[in-house]
Amino acid sequence: MLTLYGETFPSRLLLGTAAYPTPEILKQSVRTARPAMITVSLRRTGCGGEAHGQGFWSLLQETGVPVLPNTAGCQSVQEAVTTAQMAREVFETDWIKLELIGDDDTLQPDVFQLVEAAEILIKDGFKVLPYCTEDLIACRRLLDAGCQALMPWAAPIGTGLGAVHAYALKILRERLPDTPLIIDAGLGLPSQAAQVMEWGFDGVLLNTAVSRSGDPVNMARAFALAVESGRLAFEAGPVEARTKAQASTPTVGQPFWHSAEY
């Protein structure tokens, strides 16, 4: 079970809703994955009740999955705050995935503006899930601002590279043991999702890896199983890696010279 801001969710997978081949494939993918939440950009659905936006919103409601609006595309504090406030009105929720991009090529979050925007939104009653880097100090500043969960990236959005800074992510997990950490962006394979879950991360958010795959519906299922398996492995307590071989069969009854070291 995933707990965020005091609310419990049955799944540790969050799923984006952009760039699917058809609305029907999106709906089937969501139903197959059964995610905790589905993310959506206000700019994607439109605002003002036009036909396209209303139809997309109706499709999301049909899934029965809670919606997590995001501020995708925002590059200033004011823009992000305004978008979040509009999203609250449109989707009738205090949840917001806060995105504030600082570089157009890498789509890397601007952590300085991110902290400022998070402070404003939290004071305004939002439940903020900030998309951030794996930088420990930046993450601490976001927690100081009032965030109760973080969404560090594995790699730049849409790259599918997996956890490119594994050491930093592991340190982040180690140093923030009580903070829900959801890996957001950069995962391309179910095995990569399972890996970060095995490290102890609390959840995974995906979009491109599913929506742009050859078969989004089956890929959604694959990722859902990977996230579940990775978490189960973490909770089971994996054996530690070692450099020396260790027999798994008992040695009782074997000749004494079998235990000699050469």
UniProtKB/Swiss-Prot annotation:
Places the protein is found: Cytoplasm
Catalytic activity line of the entry: [ThiS sulfur-carrier protein]-C-terminal-Gly-aminoethanethioate + 2-iminoacetate + 1-deoxy-D-xylulose 5-phosphate = [ThiS sulfur-carrier protein]-C-terminal Gly-Gly + 2-[(2R,5Z)-2-carboxy-4-methylthiazol-5(2H)-ylidene]ethyl phosphate + 2 H2O + H(+)
GO CC annotations on file: cytoplasm
SUPFAM superfamilies reported for this sequence: ThiG-like
Class in the EC hierarchy, top level: transferase
Protein name as annotated: Thiazole synthase
Family indicated by similarity: Belongs to the ThiG family.
Gene3D superfamilies assigned: Aldolase class I
Function: Catalyzes the rearrangement of 1-deoxy-D-xylulose 5-phosphate (DXP) to produce the thiazole phosphate moiety of thiamine. Sulfur is provided by the thiocarboxylate moiety of the carrier protein ThiS. In vitro, sulfur can be provided by H(2)S.
Complex and partners: Homotetramer. Forms heterodimers with either ThiH or ThiS.
CDD domains hit by this protein: ThiG
Protein residues bound to 1-deoxy-D-xylulose 5-phosphate: G158, A185, G186, N207, T208
EC number(s) on file: 2.8.1.10
Record's keyword terms, sorted: Cytoplasm, Schiff base, Thiamine biosynthesis, Transferase
Ranges in a coiled coil: none
One GO MF term attached to the UniProt entry: thiazole synthase activity
Active site per database record: K97
GO terms classed as biological process: thiamine diphosphate biosynthetic process
Pathway this chain belongs to: Cofactor biosynthesis; thiamine diphosphate biosynthesis
Keyword Transport: no
